[in-house]
Amino acid sequence: MPIRGSGSNHAPDVPGYTLRDYGSRVGVFRIMDVLEQFNIRASVLLNAEVCQHHPAIIEEGNKREWEWLGHGMTNSISMLDYPVEEELDIIRKVKQIVTSATGKAPKGWLGPGLGETFNTPDHLAAEGFEYVCDWGCDEQPVPMRVKSGRMIVVPYELGVNDIRVFIRENHTPEEYYRMVCDHFDTLYRDSATGGRVLCLPLHPFVIGLPYRIKYLEKALDYICSHDGVWRTTGWEIADWYYRHYYEDPGRYEG
């Protein structure tokens, strides 16, 4: 099967595969070391097949108390690619595999390629998921209407996403560092009137390369040097929102 986003429509796609495999073999552990320096726990968008092929990643992530979100079976298959009648079964399968591998049922979800059908939020809520990240429409959590259960958006960031910055827009590592710091500066200023979510999407095969990783380290050092920065996970943000704002989204606690 061709690798989504690699630029090749052929299989086997050796360059596309080896770069991504490098991320699983080397890059992810390099990211672990950097995050650990700053006492940051990752919120991992976990393809279920990673649980089956790379158990060492799960083991090391659990040691660091990382959060695991559902992220489909594989990034090569969007939720939009499945027949409509199969989507719920796929969500259930992903939840079962992730729960079995990590020891905890995932509470969050981001679709491969941010893909959703009109039924996805309802299916997720029915299966016990409580937040979704596909909707990067705000800088704060947003409640969603679902048929059963409950659901909110904890926004995923596209602007300083390392794939967009490096692969699609061809920025340098130095420019990435400056972009992340500028992004943070604006959110930090705006947080005076209400908290903001700074989601920093990292892909091990992108930011985990040797000549890029130190710029992530520099950016995190800058961010964490500021007072009042909450180094937290997606679920902890969602849980806070549910406990304080879900029933009255317009309320502000000064």
Q: For the regions a protein language model found, what residue spans apply to each?
A:
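A structural motif
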Residues: 146-164
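Catalytic alpha-helical scaffold of carbohydrate-active enzymes acting on polysaccharides/glycoconjugates
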Residues: 1-152, 177-200, 206-254
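Binuclear metal-dependent hydrolase catalytic cores centered on His/Asp/Glu-rich metal-binding motifs
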Residues: 158, 164-179
